[in-house]
Amino acid sequence: MTEDFISSVKRSNEELKERKSNFGFVEYKSKQLTSSSSHNSNSSHHDDDNQHGKRNIFQRCVDSFKSPLDGSFDTSNLKRTLKPRHLIMIAIGGSIGTGLFVGSGKAIAEGGPLGVVIGWAIAGSQIIGTIHGLGEITVRFPVVGAFANYGTRFLDPSISFVVSTIYVLQWFFVLPLEIIAAAMTVQYWNSSIDPVIWVAIFYAVIVSINLFGVRGFGEAEFAFSTIKAITVCGFIILCVVLICGGGPDHEFIGAKYWHDPGCLANGFPGVLSVLVVASYSLGGIEMTCLASGETDPKGLPSAIKQVFWRILFFFLISLTLVGFLVPYTNQNLLGGSSVDNSPFVIAIKLHHIKALPSIVNAVILISVLSVGNSCIFASSRTLCSMAHQGLIPWWFGYIDRAGRPLVGIMANSLFGLLAFLVKSGSMSEVFNWLMAIAGLATCIVWLSINLSHIRFRLAMKAQGKSLDELEFVSAVGIWGSAYSALINCLILIAQFYCSLWPIGGWTSGKERAKIFFQNYLCALIMLFIFIVHKIYYKCQTGKWWGVKALKDIDLETDRKDIDIEIVKQEIAEKKMYLDSRPWYVRQFHFWC
């Protein structure tokens, strides 16, 4: 065993030298863990565990930041400690945040209650196709980074590099914004305390959670999502009571505001504006599959199916009911992104319920912290995936003994320090332009997922593989991904339209140019990154394009090791069972 361990270390050192000699970049090589290497790794960890009794807590903490004992930099060093309950709650409450609680105010003002229903229904329908397509691939290939890895495999390395880079930049810039938003939210109760103090506290909390590893992230998100879900459920019940006249004023509201001032504001342009807001409120939906390298893939299908109910219940129903309680002409819906602009808070205040605004404000604070927590998780895992594909320097993929992608966490944490500009007079303008760099990231990522799933299905067909080989099959299939791709293109066009002809008009040509570039600067940045990476790729490989023919796409590397015959038998048995059940039971299993 000692000789095997020494030879394993030598191989790892040779691999490390090879990486360093290539200017920090590595060629993408999928790594298969052999039984012998797994045995050596397990033996090393066993020896390490035996030493724990001889070390104090401080020593163990310091050692956890060191590189793995076998010297490898493989993504297999990530810990699969996320449990199904974590995934399900991340799926249910993961994207319930400021987009729903605050951003929806602008949507109601510009589109009216009916425009909100139409916009969120369209955006939500494409999410179902996107997440089911991503889930199908992820269960088949449960690797860290999910779509960041699949873009290289099914599309083109340059496309994957652009999409992953923009996605990472988005989370880099969102983190300081969310920390500032959390500090400003506290001002609702006490404005006498310097916001810099709150920035420091929230920054420390978010970074500390992620330093506890994926288990810390999972437990925090489980708690955050549970609170958010309970709050939305309670608010839905409250809305029904108020609409029916059960409030303090005992006034029956019904569809009063749908008639006066009306159900649709600004016509078709208003619906387009709502569509853009809705798409960003649903951002982060892909987080469920992003954690596939750190959880048991068996829990993914159930978590993926929860997305349908989340969109229906937490977004469509809650926003429809808010539209019955708040007229779109309410001035508090416009002119800001603070708690006072939340349609949920406005609805409660309009009907004179005194204690609840503070409760909703507390939930908004939790939502902001949840998004900040997700920022570091998403960016660090994507950077780790990019590093192991050879798209960026290998040291971005460093994973310590505790299974943390440490360099990725540190990189986003450094950007988080920008939150201390909270008292700067030009802070708002600076962050508006920083966010413009990654402004289209959400839709671009979803579009790449749709195209990856379409190429995956076509590759399976070209290579003579059956869908019976898949443990999880998208409920909407390849046509669902095609529909989602079409809707994502429509959202990008809608944002282009709203950038050129914003609702309310503009005062000057300078303002028009500013609005356009803040909305579409991302497209120019992406084009520049794509061209630069294409030149680099050409120099490295001698080819301009890395798109593979369908028959040449690798459908085996990183594939989950399963017995296809057993999978087919399990699917057949489940089908026989469901065929004997009533239609509503079949529908429940289909969507849940």
From Swiss-Prot:
Keyword Membrane appears in the UniProt entry: yes
TM regions (residue ranges): 88-108, 114-134, 161-181, 193-213, 227-247, 267-287, 307-327, 359-379, 405-425, 429-449, 473-493, 515-535
Alphabetized UniProt keyword annotations: Amino-acid transport, Membrane, Transmembrane, Transmembrane helix, Transport
Membrane association type: Multi-pass membrane protein
Intracellular or extracellular location(s): Membrane
GO CC annotation, single: membrane
Cytoplasmic-side positions: 1-87, 135-160, 214-226, 288-306, 380-404, 450-472, 536-592
Classification via InterPro entries: AA-permease/SLC12A_dom, Amino_acid_permease_CS, Amino_acid_permease_fungi, APC_YAT, RNA3'P_cycl/enolpyr_Trfase_a/b
Topological domains annotated Extracellular: 109-113, 182-192, 248-266, 328-358, 426-428, 494-514
Single Gene Ontology BP annotation: aromatic amino acid transport
GO molecular function per UniProt: amino acid transmembrane transporter activity; aromatic amino acid transmembrane transporter activity; catalytic activity; high-affinity tryptophan transmembrane transporter activity
Region (Disordered): 31-53
Any one Pfam family match given in the protein's UniProt record, by short name: AA_permease
PANTHER family cross-referenced by the UniProt entry: AMINO ACID PERMEASE (PTHR43341), TRYPTOPHAN PERMEASE (PTHR43341:SF16)
The family this protein is said to belong to: Belongs to the amino acid-polyamine-organocation (APC) superfamily. YAT (TC 2.A.3.10) family.
Protein role: Required for high-affinity tryptophan transport. Also transports cysteine, phenyalanine and tyrosine.
Other remarks on this protein: Present with 752 molecules/cell in log phase SD medium.
Matches recorded under NCBIfam families: 2A0310
Name of the featured protein: Tryptophan permease
Species annotation: Saccharomyces cerevisiae (strain ATCC 204508 / S288c) (Baker's yeast)
